[in-house]
Amino acid sequence: MKTWPSRAVSLLLLALALPVGCSEPPPPVRDPDTLATIRERGELVVLTLAGPTSLIENEDGPPSGYEVDLANAFAASLGVTARFEVAASLPDLFDALAAGDGHVAAAGLTLTPERSERLAFSPVYKSVTEQLVCRRGGVNPTRLERLPDADIVVLEGSSYEETLRAIGVTHTALRWRTRPGGSAMPLLEAVDDGQADCTIADSHLADFARRRHPELIVARNLTGEQPLAWAYDARIDGLGEALSAWFATAHADGLLEALDETWFGRFGDYDYVDVARFVRRVENRLPRYRRLFEAAADELPFEWELLAAQAYQESHWDPDAVSATGVRGLMMLTLSTAERVGIDDRTDPEQSIVGGAAYLDDLYERVPDSVTGPDRLWFALAAYNVGMGHMYDARRLAERLGRDKDSWDDLAEILPLLSDPAHYSTLRYGYARGHEPVRYVAKIREYRALLAAQDL
């Protein structure tokens, strides 16, 4: 089990566990902590699993991820830091919780009737759908009666086994295989490689996986919405009450919604052609320029994945790209912008990346101070696309219409109005194709997320 000490950041919740097999001796059980001892030690021990929707392991820093942010936020509410213990599999996670090796289990755990009989859970913080994921052109059981025709492999100890057992009551020929592990992602990759016909994954993971492996398809939903919650050690006096109070506050304050948007709201409608092209170009174009993106990011407060994602949206990583309006290169710079940032050859990959990154940094610094957090970056990216003047106009219009001029979500709804004569005629910078920066930012966020998780 891998361990990370971590500091506090955003929000959370999660849940799960299973009984120990009757043929194995039960694990030794530690004496339970109390909330007071947790605070005295300054540490909340969080059991979790590695995967795109829970915890992402970073070679050069602490882990990141949806569940990491949630757990960090809850730990901060207690005045402590979170230490993450990463289990190798779901059964290991459940055993560790039963043995008292952790205070909470936060790993995208589905709150099922079987688990509820054995474990204590936090309030529900997210809902997902269990989906049957298969390979394009392969076995595609869109009807339940066709499920026995498929070679199905699922995660050992998962809620997916419970789902299949329930289906098997009426479809008695149904069979499936299981594999141990902490995430369904390797099973999705196995389906993509032809090692199995289908697997089951939560909808937010399936959505992510299809953007890395475009030949995967969702054959059908197997459940309605399923609740996710944290499991916790019920022997710790006051922990359940603390979780209930914190989740209620996190929901009321919009923290759960914000975190969900940060990690899972970045994907728009699925476009098979676009995703397949992106995957090909990650393989055959990105390696030529990755070092240049990394070097540019080292000098600025941006991740290399962000710069690479922006360049892909601009030019599909084509250094000779040129538009009808005369912008050129990987970062599609205008002649005046190139002169402003001090480059003389817009088609030179290194110069283009350095110049584009410098220009984005300049825009970022010019965003009003009242715009904070991720919204500041989305604002700067939109300005790169449509111009800072039009972004200022959008802020003015947002204010007139009673919207929050500092919120990217609100501006994303206001910007398309810049093509409406009733509005742009009253603004300083006039007409703009305001839907374009909205799509521009959305696509960069999607590509950035895929690049950041490419090594998972």
From Swiss-Prot:
GO terms for biological process: cell wall macromolecule catabolic process; cell wall organization; peptidoglycan catabolic process. Residues 1-22 form the signal peptide. It is found in: Cell outer membrane. The N-terminal domain does not have lytic activity and probably modulates enzymatic activity. The C-terminal domain is the catalytic active domain. GO terms for molecular function: peptidoglycan lytic transglycosylase activity. The keyword Cell wall biogenesis/degradation applies. The active site is at E314. It comes from Maricaulis maris (strain MCS10) (Caulobacter maris). This is Membrane-bound lytic murein transglycosylase F. SMART domains: PBPb. In the N-terminal section; belongs to the bacterial solute-binding protein 3 family. In the C-terminal section; belongs to the transglycosylase Slt family. Its EC number is 4.2.2.n1. Residues 268-456 are annotated as: LT domain. The keyword Ligase does not apply. Murein-degrading enzyme that degrades murein glycan strands and insoluble, high-molecular weight murein sacculi, with the concomitant formation of a 1,6-anhydromuramoyl product. Lytic transglycosylases (LTs) play an integral role in the metabolism of the peptidoglycan (PG) sacculus. Their lytic action creates space within the PG sacculus to allow for its expansion as well as for the insertion of various structures such as secretion systems and flagella. Residues 23-267 are annotated as: Non-LT domain. InterPro entries: Lysozyme-like_dom_sf (IPR023346), MltF (IPR023703), Solute-binding_3/MltF_N (IPR001638), Transglycosylase_SLT_dom_1 (IPR008258). It catalyses: Exolytic cleavage of the (1->4)-beta-glycosidic linkage between N-acetylmuramic acid (MurNAc) and N-acetylglucosamine (GlcNAc) residues in peptidoglycan, from either the reducing or the non-reducing ends of the peptidoglycan chains, with concomitant formation of a 1,6-anhydrobond in the MurNAc residue. GO terms for cellular component: cell outer membrane. Keywords: Cell outer membrane, Cell wall biogenesis/degradation, Lyase, Membrane, Signal. It is a peripheral membrane protein.
